[in-house]
Amino acid sequence: MKKILLAFAMLVSLTMIKAQPVHTLDLSGTWKVTWNEGGHGPQSLDDYLHTDPFQDPARFMEVPVPMELHLALQKAGLVEDINYGMNTLKARWVAEKYWLYAKTFSVPEEALKEKAWLVFDQLDLNAVIMLNGETVGTHSSAFVPCRIEVTGKLQAGENLLQIGIESGLYGVADKDGGSYLQNMGALLNKRHWMRKPQYQFLWDWNPQLINVGITGAVRLEWTESLRLDQVVVQCHLSDDLQKAMLTVKSFLEGWEQESLKIKTSVLETGQNTLTDIQIKPGLNPYTSKVEIWEPKLWWPAGQGEQPLYHVKVELLDGQTVLAEKNIRTGIRRIQIDQSSHPVVGNYFTIIVNNRKVFMKGGNWVPPEMIYSNVSRERLDALTDMAIKANFNMLRIWGGAIWAGHDLLDLCDEKGLLVWHDLLFACSKYPGDDKEFYDMVKHEVTWGVREFSPHPSLAVWCGNNENEVGTWSWGWDRFGKIMPDYGLYHLLIPVIMKEEDPSRPYWPSSPFSTEFTDPASPVTGDQHPWDVSLGAAGPDFWAYRNYVDRFPNEGGVMGASSPATIRQFLPPDEQYMRSFSWDHHDNEVNFWNYKPGIDYQFVEFWLGKSAEDLGFEKYLLASALIQAEGLNEYISNYRRRMFSTSSAIFWMYNDSWPATHGWTIVDYYLRKKLAYHPVRRAFQPVTTVLAMEHDTVKVFGVNDSPVDWQGTLRYGIFRLSGRYNVDERLPIVIPANASAVLASISAVQWNNRKATGAFGILEKDGKQVAQYRLFTERFKDMSFSKPVVKITRGKGTVTLESDVFVWGACIDVDGEKEVPDNCFDLLPGIPYTIPWTDKEMPKIEFTGNGLF
């Protein structure tokens, strides 16, 4: 009987326990740090990690946390500005040391009695966590937070927290390199084993700078009973778009049975649901649902508005709020149409809210070499410039880091859809290793849950170019054959189905269905690199015949602006091919022992070498050629909509100041000469001219959701002035379509070295878009010195030239807030741009001046 009463008393006691909220103690701030490599301290790693920082305090320096160590040492004057000159080479020692952090702290008395964790939002990379001399945990991924339970390990008074951390080089020292990658750098650093941003190990556009340190916030958490972890929001929109079901999964960690409620509210509609839940021991999901009728739909830029809903999740014990999270989301439906193409292969078209949308944009890389140092302001500026360039999509490339909430929030607000590669790029990965496999499983599960609420996040993709590497790059001829196939085709699809069935998953980029070549142009997505990196080389007119279904990586390089070049080159190295010039240059220029592809581009199109042109003219010539190439890339694909359904180029932004680069916005956020030509090529309504057989076809392209009416002016112009053909006709371009508006017989186009074809769209007497087509290279054409008249109107200026002007630039350094730049002037045809500055614009450079 006593046993029964005791058991009953225990049961009553358990049911009387009330859940308590989670308490936190911020442990960020000032820490102490020292370094060792087996000489500057104990040779034994274990002895080193248990170094008492108070025995020799002079060995330690103070650093802020969170902060990557290159940056912390730069602020302390021990490392020079990594963006300048040769300084990344001077800073490599930082990644080669084993670092030891230390911090003391005291805790409230209740923290000693309750469940407690040390939480690190990010550690890069391999970390050993020690509390009061005891190793309490390890961590080896920069892609997921670190949470270490320390219940019963805290002490009254002062606690000593020590973190031993290294960049990853020590951890892979005895691992297999050659079975996965055989380039020189990978044999040395074995990056494929490390779960951290891969671009740190050197890419063609970025030097090696292997990050290391405590790069995320640090805190102590404690609670008596349970804690709220991640909250997942999934949107399911009915076929008729009239009803949205928000499924909210709250992940709660508990240790005993108890009854609670979850209140889920949508603030904009006033709706809420109250869901009874039974807490079970462990980390488990608890689901609630909210139905919204006639929801306001979220659209990508150019297709509609971006209304956002605020969802509040509260964990209740009676009337007491134990925990809450406020989450912002949007309601939209994403599908990919892969139906059969009437000619060959399949379509690959992203459909948003039952409407086909042509994807326009660029590839995104971390905008700093030290990726944890990217500010919200920098992200805001870059996304603003993307929107102004008429983007509606960014592709987050797989060699980087999670987009993160700050970037995705901005994309949500501005209407930028996101194609997000998972974090694998250009390598075989050890998916056959259980520890690596388990880490990937944890990492992908965490990321898919964490970023689920963002309406901008449209597509998850398994990796960047790992499939095509085996198919086309000879990866099947060495080492392990597709050791990571199971990750992208088995493990991750299961995770996606369980965690986020609301978004499409694509196994690799590029990838094609039906077990065909991953780079097939007629199915799946494509990386059309034959221009720049393949057989076509510098001839970007090859783009004119490309029929790719969904090109999302391909591009043309160009030099950064003179102002940027001078900012990162030391005064005594401000000349072409100086040591710092080459160090900051794209690696592609050194793949062969001959002048690199950038120099070949200029010589191919202009017939002049870099030496012929000289420092300043060469930089502008290279930038102008990039503008031409990207215009060809974009215009070819846009005229083919929706046989082709995207024009996404490589790449949008830079991680450091580059001599030549793929980007249209450089590291210092200066607009390169290609920026405005890309903006015009992406504008919602435009015209494109293309030669097909013996006919010049004039296309009207309209990716807006309404028909466009106006006037088309088209014909053949002479570079020296006058028009051989000059026609006008009223036109209608259907909504969300490309259509042939007119044509010119090739018979009418004579003496092509002195003439070009043109098209202009006008509405209400104002020019909306213009396009010109040449079939002879610039070096073979007859350019004249122009006389340009500039006149002021009401809030505008108008430029008019007596002869054709190629690439008139009013801001060669990309530093001014000009509404347009690097535009052609057709002979005798006014070109008007908005202008409110008191000072009139001046033409600083034209392509004509290169001859």
Sequence positions of predicted segments:
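Active-site rim elements
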Residues: 91, 202-206, 479-483, 616-621
